Amino acid sequence: MSRLYLNFVQKSFKYLILLIHVNYLDASKDIHIYEYLDEIEIVSKLEDRKKGLMYRETIPDNYGMFFVWPYEKKQCMWMKDTYVPLSVAYIDEKGKITEIYDMVPLSKNSVCSIKASKYALEVNSGWFDKNEIMTGDVIKIKEILSHDK
């Protein structure tokens, strides 16, 4: 085989590996959340968002609380008076999950988004991992908001 041909094959192989790697990194998926959760409580009023899941000692396995803010900005949550370990996903206005955090019961430390968010979804701790939902995935927001009507 000629040296030129071998060089071509090597570069082609490297390019193929790069394409596979880039596609793997962008392997986000669309999430139809009602395929995963049986019940979603939507909170959009200020007083409801402030209360969140406070004072509840348990929540069902396939339950979530969906927070809606009037506009997209950096958001914060805390676990004051919340007895259940939770995970929170911060979600941008297009439905993309930008961040996921685990939160400690009764903690007064704020868990803030780094990026601007319009929505958040709180669920039992570990729920996102268990359901293989991760940052970059896109939640179909319209399905949630129309389901509430």
What are these regions, as identified by a protein language model?
Residues 7-18:
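Sec-dependent signal peptide recognition
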Residues 8, 24-30:
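N-terminal secretory targeting signals
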Residues 17-25:
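Hydrophobic h-region of N-terminal signal peptides that target proteins for export
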Residues 28-149:
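Compact, glycine-rich, soluble single-domain proteins
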